[in-house]
Amino acid sequence: MELFKYMETYDYEQVLFCQDKESGLKAIIAIHDTTLGPALGGTRMWMYNSEEEALEDALRLARGMTYKNAAAGLNLGGGKTVIIGDPRKDKNEAMFRAFGRFIQGLNGRYITAEDVGTTVADMDIIYQETDYVTGISPEFGSSGNPSPATAYGVYRGMKAAAKEAFGSDSLEGKVVAVQGVGNVAYHLCRHLHEEGAKLIVTDINKEVVARAVEEFGAKAVDPNDIYGVECDIFAPCALGGIINDQTIPQLKAKVIAGSADNQLKEPRHGDIIHEMGIVYAPDYVINAGGVINVADELYGYNRERAMKKIEQIYDNIEKVFAIAKRDNIPTYVAADRMAEERIETMRKARSPFLQNGHHILSRRRAR
């Protein structure tokens, strides 16, 4: 990869390579854009096949966070960290302490949070070295587990998508096929069940499927069969890239709305489902509840305030649909356009994360 050429093409600001020989830390921090504020994005720990693969993942994820944070209406830019290693056996306290010192050295340009392969406990260790971390334990004034917040945002966005497709945002009696019944999807199923939706679920973990069947009266199907079931709404809540050449011909749903990241295998698949008349709620807009929740910590966490902001995902999805109609484009393109328009509006303004010469987090420290 020609790194500087790639950074210039996609407007990346900074890439930092971090290593600590004593702890075994090998990390890459990618900061894509800080026009709207400091870059916020989680720390992912994964056993990558190569350093180049890790770099590509960090860059891709950082850019995605710019769009997610902008579309969510947050005064935050986009960044991401990847730590190269097996989260099951390579973690140690010294590693996360060292990583926290690297974050502190960025002086607030990047704020981290948990992601795949990291936990709240890991964030607590990082917090010993830097204030620039969210998603720490509630006893430190944090929001705790972000899964319920993410699920509530998906639920709100799904209602907006239902209104677009069916003329009403009521989910009562609607058949929703949920792919994956992990932490986020479990809470989503609870919201859907309480409104009277009928659930079809699948997961490679039979225990979580059994729980959904018992608690929500869901119907269980084989993972390979979920795409072709008769349903009103398909909710991808597991792996990315599941809207692809193989799965699209099987789909019977009128709506796609779920919590999974990077649902479209390629952009052209968004074009295909658009031409089919399927209403697609873009993933990074509908699944922003978690990042909205942790971002509220920067102001001193207030659950009521955070949940009100998460409720607005309904409005954000409606805005995406309006832009799609206005410009005659697929919704995935409209989501990008909504985020880009907000960033461009602010590009010449003074960065909001410096207020009266002080970083936004100075308010949290003062409490």
UniProtKB/Swiss-Prot annotation:
Q: State the UniProt keywords alphabetically.
A: Branched-chain amino acid catabolism, NAD, Oxidoreductase
Query: What InterPro entries has UniProt attached to this entry?
Result: Aminoacid_DH-like_N_sf (IPR046346), Glu/Leu/Phe/Val/Trp_DH (IPR006095), Glu/Leu/Phe/Val/Trp_DH_C (IPR006096), Glu/Leu/Phe/Val/Trp_DH_dimer (IPR006097), Glu/Leu/Phe/Val_DH_AS (IPR033524), Glu/Phe/Leu/Val/Trp_DH_bac/arc (IPR016211), NAD(P)-bd_dom_sf (IPR036291)
- The UniProt transmembrane annotation reads none
| Outcome of mutating residue 291 to C | Completely modifies the activity of the enzyme, which is able to catalyze the reductive amination of ketones, and no longer displays leucine dehydrogenase activity
Query: Pathway, per Swiss-Prot/TrEMBL?
Result: Amino-acid degradation; L-leucine degradation; 4-methyl-2-oxopentanoate from L-leucine (dehydrogenase route): step 1/1
- Read off the PROSITE patterns from this record: GLFV_DEHYDROGENASE (PS00074)
Enzyme Commission numbers on file: 1.4.1.9
What SUPFAM superfamilies does the annotation carry? Aminoacid dehydrogenase-like, N-terminal domain (SSF53223), NAD(P)-binding Rossmann-fold domains (SSF51735)
Catalytic residue list: 80
Which reaction equations make up its catalytic activity?
L-leucine + NAD(+) + H2O = 4-methyl-2-oxopentanoate + NH4(+) + NADH + H(+)
Give the Pfam families listed for this entry.
ELFV_dehydrog, ELFV_dehydrog_N
- Single Gene Ontology MF annotation: L-leucine dehydrogenase activity
- Say how it is used: This enzyme has been successfully altered through several rounds of protein engineering to an enantioselective amine dehydrogenase. Instead of the wild-type alpha-keto acid, the new amine dehydrogenase now accepts the analogous ketone, methyl isobutyl ketone (MIBK), which corresponds to exchange of the carboxy group by a methyl group, to produce chiral (R)-1,3-dimethylbutylamine via a reductive amination reaction.
Q: Where does NAD(+) bind?
A: 180-186
Can you tell which superkingdom this protein's organism belongs to?
A: Bacteria
One biological-process term from Gene Ontology?
Answer: L-leucine catabolic process
Annotated PANTHER family: LEUCINE DEHYDROGENASE, VALINE DEHYDROGENASE
Q: Quaternary form?
A: Homohexamer.
Q: In which family does this protein belong, per the annotation?
A: Belongs to the Glu/Leu/Phe/Val dehydrogenases family.
Describe its function. Answer: Catalyzes the reversible deamination of L-leucine to 4-methyl-2-oxopentanoate.
Name of the protein: Leucine dehydrogenase
